[in-house]
């Protein structure tokens, strides 16, 4: 039976480096950042939703399902990942951050190939120099271990991924795909690139 995969755009952060503005809603080339992600995921998976803890009504205008973290007291991206895994009706969930408008068009394909070839429950991207755990594919079988990990006070994605023998997948030929917009200056820098 074929592996089923859904995708979630992670937009639940506090955006401290962006003066608290909702990163996913900031405009790049006239379009909110999250919509760039949505567009690049559309041909990779059949079902996409958004994890957002603020401005949910605005995100819902995109026509996709929007949900907040179930755990209280903002606990980082793993909290959104846990909620997504617990809600999923697919075997795996593909995760991407809302502030990475150039994400790889073959992200799902390469991460899926890695988990299938290794029989691992998760895979995540690297660009040849840095790990990018927010670009990841996780089995829904990880929801109980992830809940236990968060309840024990841990928050580091890579630590959890390594504990569960996550496969780091090389995207060094697409390094630019992992550029993320952490500040308004980052967005300004890329306004005219790829236009």
Swiss-Prot record:
Keyword NAD: no
Domain of life: Bacteria
Residues annotated as transmembrane: none
UniProt subcellular location: Cytoplasm
Binding, GTP: 10-12, 23, 51, 69, 99
Uppermost EC category: transferase
Catalytic activity, as annotated: Mo-molybdopterin + GTP + H(+) = Mo-molybdopterin guanine dinucleotide + diphosphate
Binding site for Mg(2+): 99
A GO-annotated cellular component: cytoplasm
GO BP term (any one): bis(molybdopterin guanine dinucleotide)molybdenum biosynthetic process
Listed Pfam families: NTP_transf_3
Keywords of the record: Cytoplasm, GTP-binding, Magnesium, Metal-binding, Molybdenum cofactor biosynthesis, Nucleotide-binding, Transferase
Coiled-coil region list: none
Broad class of where this protein is predominantly found: cytoplasm
Gene Ontology MF term list: GTP binding; metal ion binding; molybdenum cofactor guanylyltransferase activity
Subunit-structure text: Monomer.
Entry comment, domain topic: The N-terminal domain determines nucleotide recognition and specific binding, while the C-terminal domain determines the specific binding to the target protein.
Protein family per UniProt: Belongs to the MobA family.
Name of the protein in question: Molybdenum cofactor guanylyltransferase
